[in-house]
Amino acid sequence: MSTIRSFEDLKAKRQEILDRKAARNGKTIINVSLATCSIAAGGKVAMEAMQDEVAKNGLTGVEFMQSSCMTYCYAEPTVEITLPGKDPVVFGGVDENRARELVTEYVMKGEPVEGIIPVNYERVVL
């Protein structure tokens, strides 16, 4: 990350963030926690399974991201999915089978899938 040294740097960073956010409009965002604990619990396997399922079903408009700790240690691996126009939903205990189910049921059909972690806070996303 670059250092912001002036007001112009700050304005440029703001524009970069706004451009990144605008590019995501209309896309499904799948954010997989890949902190050490999640990787140990199978997070990489879950992400690869979801990417495979998206490709297998020919889905477009799906963007994968990876994040560090989501603070749900008891529920690793965790996946946050944001469907266009919807609030993010976090799923826990996502193994390979559940990862595939998340794509076919939640991403493709919008149907709830077991493993939703209730959210009790408001999140600010840049």
Swiss-Prot record:
Inhibited by oxygen. Keywords: NADP, Oxidoreductase. Its EC number is 1.12.1.3. InterPro entries: Thioredoxin-like_sf (IPR036249). It comes from the Bacteria. GO terms for molecular function: hydrogen dehydrogenase (NADP+) activity. Optimum pH is 8. It catalyses: H2 + NADP(+) = NADPH + H(+). Gene3D superfamilies: Glutaredoxin. Catalyzes the reduction of NADP in the presence of molecular H2 to yield NADPH. Heterotetramer composed of HndA, HndB, HndC and HndD subunits. HndA and HndB could form a heterodimeric intermediate in the electron transfer between the active site of hydrogenase subunit HndD and the NADP reduction site of the reducing subunit HndC. This is NADP-reducing hydrogenase subunit HndB. It comes from Solidesulfovibrio fructosivorans (Desulfovibrio fructosivorans).
